[in-house]
Design a protein with these regions (language model features):
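N-terminus-centered regions that define maturation/targeting leaders and the start
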Residues: 1-170
């Protein structure tokens, strides 16, 4: 299985990051999700789930920041279109990102269950998109947590792939 994302000078394009135009922002965060493709999905895959996280946030806030959580994607090759987090053309479920936690306390805001784009405070952060091919359907509703996803995937992961998407605060 592989993930394909179009980068701009080896970085996630500005439109999907802290450098986005104001019309692509909500609560001072970018909200237009980037397009990408998932190819060569293994046989027997019933569902695809993915997470976009930032390990480089650990020195900043003390934990891996969750930017986007999705489950319920059909288990075959797929092109995920731009802004699919807000438009949901693939009929998936979305979990809580880190804005729903106690630091931002935005659990009641729509952004808490959608793409919350990268906003590194300094330097370059690598945002990791991890895609999971699963041999079962998880049947989540919107508003699940990352730990629930991890626990429910245990023993059901056929394949897992990652890609790092650098974003620079310049």
């Amino acid at each position: 299985m592989k993930i394909e994302v179009n980068l701009d000078n080896n970085r996630l394009p500005d439109k999907y990051t802290r450098h986005a135009a104001v019309e692509y922002m909500e609560h001072d965060f970018p909200v237009v999700s980037f397009p990408f493709s998932i190819k060569d999905v293994p046989a027997g895959t019933k569902e695809i789930a993915f997470a976009l996280t930032d390990l480089d946030s650990i020195p900043v806030c003390g934990f891996e920041w969750i930017h986007w959580l999705v489950a319920g994607l059909d288990g075959h090759d797929v092109d995920v279109p731009e802004d699919s987090s807000r438009n949901n053309p693939l009929n998936w479920t979305q979990g809580y990102n880190s804005s729903a936690g106690h630091i931002y306390d935005m659990k009641d805001q729509p952004i808490s269950q959608h793409y919350m784009g990268p906003k590194p405070p300094s330097g370059v952060h690598d945002y990791t998109l991890t895609v999971y091919a699963l041999n079962t359907k998880l049947n989540f509703n919107d508003g699940f947590w990352y730990n629930e996803l991890i626990h429910n995937m245990a023993g059901h992961i056929i394949e897992k792939v990652k890609i790092d998407l650098p974003v620079e605060n310049n």
